[in-house]
């Protein structure tokens, strides 16, 4: 029988609710039936979350410095202890450089562990973009951090649920900038990424739908020309490459 995958879970911003979410999630025994979870964060913060939730009699925190030290047993939460948070200064709901630095380093560490094959997959709790930028790390979100630290030039975010997967042309930018980013090459790049990603996760014949930008997809130019000038040409080229876009137009 194959071993259960090791899942590295970042604790998220220490001033947020990631530690509590993690405790609640790992208080469910079914999680351990499917995988071997380990939190990448601060053991002291996790201990605090356990107390806040009143689960001291159910959950114990096991701090480790190496994934190999984890025991992966229900009732015990393994924490790869980064020791980055001064609990005397810790305050929930307060944006700070300290918490931004910690949250950022948790993400960097989980990526490093995955790249070294010490864990099989990563899961992230929420970070505060303001806090990580306050700490000097100028990223707009997890996607950009992952891309940078895995040396990936072409990327986008994918949201997945059951049979639906959504890929973004743009992510954390203003609405004005998002509209400006709807260009043929970027749309085509995202179509290709979506198609390849679906195949990578086992969907043999992906069906790609491409959203329009304007009301009623521009109504043949009445409400905008992006569909005509940028999106349709990207769809045409993608179909020429053999990518299956059933509607053959933005929808």
What are these regions (language model features)?
Residues 73, 154, 163-165:
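A generic structural signal for well-ordered coil/turn residues at beta-strand boundaries
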Residues 76-79, 157, 166:
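Conserved beta-strand scaffold positions in the cores of enzyme catalytic domains, especially
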Residues 1-142, 185-209, 213-251:
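Contiguous, glycine/small-aliphatic-enriched amphipathic segments in soluble metabolic enzymes
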Residues 159-189:
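Ligand-binding beta-strand-loop-alpha-helix segment within the catalytic cores
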Residues 147-160:
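FAD-binding core/adjacent interface of flavoenzyme oxidoreductases
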């Amino acid at each position: 029988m194959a071993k259960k995958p090791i899942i590295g879970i970042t604790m998220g911003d220490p001033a947020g609710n990631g530690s509590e979410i993690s405790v609640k999630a790992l208080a469910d025994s079914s999680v351990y039936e499917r995988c071997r979870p380990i939190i990448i964060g601060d053991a002291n913060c996790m201990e605090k979350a356990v107390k806040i939730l009143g689960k001291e009699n159910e959950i114990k925190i096991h701090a480790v410095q190496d994934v190999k030290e984890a025991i992966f047993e229900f009732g015990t939460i393994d924490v790869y202890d980064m020791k980055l948070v001064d609990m005397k200064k810790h305050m929930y709901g307060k944006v700070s450089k300290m918490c931004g630095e910690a949250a950022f380093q948790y993400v960097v560490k989980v990526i490093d562990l995955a790249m070294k094959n010490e864990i099989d997959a990563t899961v992230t709790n929420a970070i505060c973009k303001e806090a990580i930028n306050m700490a000097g790390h100028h990223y707009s979100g997890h996607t950009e951090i992952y891309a940078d630290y895995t040396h990936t030039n072409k990327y986008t975010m994918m949201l997945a649920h059951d049979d639906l997967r959504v890929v973004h042309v743009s992510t954390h930018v203003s609405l004005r900038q998002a509209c400006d980013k709807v260009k043929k090459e970027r749309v085509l790049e995202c179509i290709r990424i979506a198609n390849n990603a679906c195949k990578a996760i086992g969907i043999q014949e992906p069906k790609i739908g491409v959203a329009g930008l304007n009301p009623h997809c521009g109504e043949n130019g009445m409400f905008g020309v992006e569909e005509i000038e940028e999106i349709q040409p990207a769809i045409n080229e993608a179909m020429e490459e053999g990518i299956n876009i059933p509607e053959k137009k933005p929808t």
